[in-house]
A protein has these predicted regions:
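Residues at the C-termini of beta-strands that transition into short coil/loop
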Residues: 37, 79, 137
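Acidic, PIN/NYN-like endoribonuclease modules and their adjacent C-terminal/linker elements
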Residues: 108-139
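Short, well-structured N-terminal submotif of metal-dependent ribonuclease cores
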Residues: 1-35, 39, 48-66
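A generic structural signal for short hydrophobic patches within well-formed alpha-helices
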Residues: 9, 40-43, 83, 126
């Protein structure tokens, strides 16, 4: 299972997505590609902050299409299992003097609870968290 982080999903919403990311994604079984409820929040929040207009409308349509057609509703929630994993990750990182941003630790918790690989360009945000991480830009 691959979880798309916010930056990967956002990159796919561009008018002309990076060919390397598209090729990487096309090489995966569609049913193995998921995202998280935290990522959905981050994208929707970003869209809400945009001024009304054609750009926002196009991005909202691209996001809806990504969720409905590309991911076919494959969105994992931040549930009890994810919260349990996130709590352990956050506490371990805080004790080590390397606190993690709350949304990143929630995404990490979801990935850890599902034993999923996280696809992100921000590999350094997730280093040392005990997750399998892949950067689609360099994969």
């Amino acid at each position: 299972m691959i979880l798309l982080d916010t930056n990967v999903l956002s990159a796919l919403m561009r008018r002309h997505p990076d060919a390397a990311i598209v090729a990487w994604l096309d090489g995966l079984p569609p049913e193995s590609v998921w995202t998280t409820s935290v990522t959905v929040f981050e994208v929707r929040f970003g869209l809400e902050l945009l001024a009304a207009g054609r750009r926002r409308q196009r991005l909202e349509e691209a996001f809806a299409m990504a969720l409905e057609e590309d991911l076919e509703g494959r969105v994992l929630p931040f549930d009890q299992a994810a919260a349990g994993s996130a709590e352990l990750i956050a506490a371990r990182q805080r004790r080590a003097g390397r606190p993690v941003e709350i949304r990143d630790v929630q995404i990490a918790g979801i990935a850890a609870a599902r034993k999923a690989t996280l696809a992100t360009r921000n590999v350094r945000h997730f280093e040392g968290l005990g997750l399998a991480v892949v950067d689609p830009w360099t994969a």
